[in-house]
């Protein structure tokens, strides 16, 4: 786990020049426009909270896991199951290159996150959400953000 954190830090430093870290309210607007508010019963606050605890709203966040797979982007979507990293035999359920999940354009990441919620166990896929967001009052996550 410690190694994963160090590799994440290195990844952020290497890609820092191209990195975009969104603000909470900017993400609230993007997520709202993308139809995430109440998607499969999860409020906008759930999505904003989850993104914060998964990536700190950093579009280029990458975490190398012990099994050699990598979690990518603002939602930390895993390469083994959800995206294509290269020649490895990943499942690529989202039919997207992992590199598309670490750009400032969140379209592919949002589409993939919706697929994860719909096809797995809701937001339980994300440990950050389970630990910090699940079952809590999340109304403050969109407070003062000018979203409905």
Swiss-Prot record:
One of its GO terms (molecular function) is lysozyme activity. This is Lysozyme-like protein 2. It comes from the Eukaryota. Expressed in testis, epididymis and placenta. CDD domains: LYZ_C. Residues 20-148 form the C-type lysozyme domain. InterPro entries: Glyco_hydro_22, Glyco_hydro_22_CS, Glyco_hydro_22_lys, Lysozyme-like_dom_sf. It catalyses: Hydrolysis of (1->4)-beta-linkages between N-acetylmuramic acid and N-acetyl-D-glucosamine residues in a peptidoglycan and between N-acetyl-D-glucosamine residues in chitodextrins. Monomer. Gene3D superfamilies: 1.10.530.10. Belongs to the glycosyl hydrolase 22 family. Residues 1-19 form the signal peptide. PROSITE patterns: GLYCOSYL_HYDROL_F22_1 (PS00128), GLYCOSYL_HYDROL_F22_2 (PS51348). One of its GO terms (cellular component) is extracellular region. Glycans are attached at residue 58. Its EC number is 3.2.1.17. Keywords: Disulfide bond, Glycoprotein, Glycosidase, Hydrolase, Secreted, Signal. The active site is at 54, 71. It is found in: Secreted. Disulfide bonds join 25-145, 49-133, 83-98, 94-112.
